[in-house]
Design a protein with these regions (language model features):
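Conserved beta-ketoacyl condensing-enzyme motif
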Residues: 6, 21, 27-160, 189-198, ...
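Glycine-/small-residue-rich "gating" segment that lines the acyl/pantetheine channel
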Residues: 122-129, 167-170, 174, 190-246, ...
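ACP-dependent fatty acid/polyketide chain-elongation machinery
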Residues: 1-65, 242-254, 349-363, 407-411
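Conserved small-residue
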Residues: 8, 26, 80, 101, ...
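Active-site-proximal alpha-helical scaffold in enzymes
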Residues: 76-89, 138-142, 146-190, 228-249, ...
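Phosphate/pyrophosphate-binding loops at sites that engage ATP/ADP/AMP, CoA/4′-phosphopantetheine
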Residues: 83-95, 244-250, 281-297, 319-323
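Acyl-CoA/ACP chain-elongation machinery
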Residues: 37, 180-225, 258-272, 300-309, ...
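Condensing-enzyme catalytic core mediating Claisen C-C bond formation in acyl metabolism
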Residues: 3-7, 34, 212-288, 297, ...
Length: 411
């Protein structure tokens, strides 16, 4: 199988636009939570979200293109262009049919549907925006990135709820391994902080109703109360190793393993024994030929819901046994909230930066251990540690599990 490396990364997040800004804020435990500004939450139980600040689509594409994209697509294009530039790709020197795209969104645009429903109620169905459907559907993130950058290879839209970003990167990795592409832009995007989105997740009792930004998102903590909705995008450039070497690209890391399973258990809850997530992690390690004792760090799904954090902890213990207590496990969602379809992609980027810098970020806000959840969740200010590998987990509604293993590039 062909080897696959990372040569570019881009991010739009609640704590910074651009990977460098995002990463500096992660290291400082900057919190991205605040009062929802997109709509009036007076009648809602939830008033806090992790919104992207100071973003304007026209800064990343021409005004006409931006007008024909919903926010989730604009975020994806912005992140993709950053990754594309860092990778130093020149499409005039590439076969465009060998450069593809695997960018998913868990939801697409609820806002486009909201607007259409209001229009029908107020003025009738004939007044709906002719572009309503292409504005709304989730595959348009991959479509618009391909259009903006001239990518004519395989174009995928993975939709696996909260595991979308990780599956998107994993499937891009597979595409390059198997020879379907030489380069893939891969990741996830989401922008669902809107009346229907917040109401829906609130009705599920999945969201924290805590209004204190310092206490609303507490992954693995005894006082956790649900996740905080976030938004943004993460996109990476994956590339076949020899292709990257031939064009003199700077290699940031290598992707060496990918595991994907289904719990076949429940539409929202992970399997209570963690068996599905454990198997996904095991598959990623087995593909890479990495022994369990060689892995010292996991970037967990860590949503701060009661079920996820407990069952994910069980999954880690199930696979690693006593070695689980030697590892460090953290949650980036403690700072940016849950980016839904973009979560796994932004957390993949976090893993690459942690390996590059030799620094494992803290789980912000973690202070009070819970029964049975007794692993090292990285309290305090983070730790300096030379990492050879980082494993990123994502668990999505419907029982979708994905794990992807990143290796330090030192050749």
């Amino acid at each position: 199988m062909r080897r696959v490396v990372v040569t570019g990364m881009g991010a739009v997040t609640p704590i910074g636009i651009g990977v460098d800004t995002f990463w500096e804020n992660v290291k400082k435990k900057t919190l991205g939570f605040g009062e929802i500004t997109r709509f009036d939450t007076t009648d809602y139980k939830v008033h806090i979200a992790a919104e992207v600040k100071d973003f304007a689509g026209k800064d990343y594409m021409d005004f006409k293109a931006a007008k024909r994209m919903e926010l989730f697509c604009q975020y994806a294009v912005a992140a993709a262009k950053e990754a594309f530039v860092q990778a130093g790709l020149d499409m005039e020197k590439e076969d465009p049919f060998r450069v593809g795209c695997s960018i998913g969104s868990g939801i697409g645009s609820l806002q486009a549907a909201e607007t259409a429903c209001h229009k029908i109620a107020e003025k009738g169905p004939s007044r709906v925006n002719p572009l309503m459907v292409p504005l709304m559907i989730s595959n348009m993130a991959a479509g618009n990135v391909s259009i903006q950058l001239g990518l004519k290879g395989k174009s995928l839209n993975v939709v696996t709820a909260c595991a979308t970003g990780t599956h998107s990167i994993g499937e891009a990795y597979r595409s390059i391994q198997c020879g379907d592409a030489d380069v893939m832009l891969a990741g996830g995007t989401e922008a669902s902080i809107c009346p229907v989105g917040v109401a829906g997740f609130t009705a599920l009792t999945a969201l924290s109703t805590v209004d204190d930004p310092e206490k609303c998102s507490l992954p693995f903590d005894k006082n956790r109360s649900g996740f905080v909705m976030g938004e943004g995008s993460g996109v990476v450039v994956l590339e076949e190793l020899e292709h990257a070497r031939q064009r003199g690209a700077k290699i940031l890391a290598e992707v060496v393993g990918y595991g994907a399973t289904s719990d076949a258990y429940h539409i929202t809850s992970p399997a209570e024994d963690g068996s599905g997530a454990a198997k996904a992690m095991e598959l990623a390690l087995e593909e890479a030929g990495v022994k369990k004792e060689e892995l010292m760090y996991i970037n967990a799904h860590g949503t701060a819901t009661h079920h996820n954090d407990l069952f994910e902890t069980r999954a880690i213990k199930k696979l690693f046994g006593e070695h689980a207590y030697e590892m460090k496990v953290n949650s980036t969602k403690s700072m940016v909230g849950h980016l839904l379809g973009a979560a796994g992609a932004v957390e993949f980027i976090t893993c690459v930066k942690e390996i590059e810098d030799g620094f494992i970020h803290a789980t912000a806000g973690y202070t009070t251990p819970d029964e049975e959840m007794d692993l090292n969740y990285v309290a305090g200010d983070g730790v300096e540690e030379n990492l050879e590998y980082a494993l990123s987990n994502s668990l999505g509604f419907g029982g979708h599990n994905a794990s992807i293993l990143v290796k330090k590039w030192d050749i």
